[in-house]
Amino acid sequence: MIKDISFKKFKKLIDIDFSFDKDVNIISGTNGTCKTTLLHLISNGFQMPKVRSPNYNNNNCLKVIKTINRIANPKMEAIVRESKSYTDPAEGTKGNLFSINYLDGSALDFRKHNSTNPDEAQRYAIKPLYPRGGPKQSLPAKPVLYLGLSRLFPIGETKDDDLTKISLNLPDQYVDYISQLYKDFLGISISNIESNNIGDFKSGPLFDTDNPEIDSNTISSGEDNLFIIVKALVSLRYYFESLLVSNDIKESILLIDEFDATLHPSLQLRLLAKIREYARSYKIQVFFTTHSLSL
């Protein structure tokens, strides 16, 4: 996982270093200060582990996690839409743009790579700057779940034709964890928990409750957002508990853009406490952006 990032130049991040906690990191700042960009670069610093491994007690775990959580291990070029004309994120700077130091003592430098695909002429990728002739290096293999602002699109405003039921689901034990956490936060008992793909941009909840007037189609945006965050936490718990051996300081990363969006301040604090608990118990390193004054 990430210990610190040192920037030479990338957009507005010039000659600046960021050090991170191994558990939970809150990124705050005014609008347009590259908070979300920082999340993108963190995700870009990892690769998805192999789907099958002799270290899994359940070889289905990563497939399930990737399917029910919309964005896993995204790369910069896949989640960022740049300006209409090409904009160099590090004009006048070549080679190393920034360096990531990982908790295991390893480090990687990163460079810009312009796409050679004419259909992606305005996009660039951020790739490791591997030294020539040195020892072979590669991105650390850890699952990263990225919860962007697309998760806030209200399911109640979605046409039925845009909803597709996801056939895979977490094991019953972990579905029960989601149900219990949701009840602890909101006092709502949910059952028959599954997931829906909403278009091609969001994985939303599908469930019933003990109140006939409330189900996954009628919940508020905040209740929807809470479910998605809780599902991501439990998914990474499932991954950790699927490992036969865990020798690393951290085993996964959770990234949340605008953590406080749609959530009442009191719920933000309670959810933050639960995130800290999960980060420590299940070896998750968490990063989220916020405009909250209370967090």
Feature annotation, model-predicted:
Residues 145-249:
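Extended helical coiled-coil dimerization/tether regions that scaffold
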